[in-house]
């Protein structure tokens, strides 16, 4: 996987994470990542991006991103806020048609994880 941002674990403890990974239309990963990066400042008003990657081998048309939230209520609030943000909605109009498959996994760190 190739990183597209500096891995940025959140400050403090007690976080949960959402790992989202998408399979995109053949050849569209670069364009999708460009649109995503342009819209990211608007999305980060609601929650913090920890990492953004794309695959280089295996499935070359996949992107992955990891988000941190203090709890599930904060996740719901962030997603609701972003869904009303005009700039984020504009990204969804551009990036959405490129998606072929979307997956989301909620992760809770173990008590020995550095990402608590």
What are these regions (language model features)?
Residues 1-116:
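Short S/T/G/P-rich N-terminal loop/turn motif that feeds into the first structured element of a domain
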């Amino acid at each position: 996987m190739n990183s597209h941002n500096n891995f940025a674990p959140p400050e403090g403890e007690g976080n949960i994470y959402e790992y989202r990974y998408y399979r995109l239309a053949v050849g569209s990963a670069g364009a999708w990542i460009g649109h995503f990066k342009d819209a990211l400042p608007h999305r980060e008003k609601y929650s913090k991006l920890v990492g953004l990657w794309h695959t280089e081998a295996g499935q070359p048309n996949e992107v992955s991103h990891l988000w941190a939230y203090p709890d599930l209520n904060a996740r719901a609030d962030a997603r609701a806020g972003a869904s009303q943000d005009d700039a984020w909605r504009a990204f969804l109009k551009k990036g959405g048609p490129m998606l072929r498959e979307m997956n989301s996994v909620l992760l809770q760190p173990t008590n020995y994880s550095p990402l608590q």
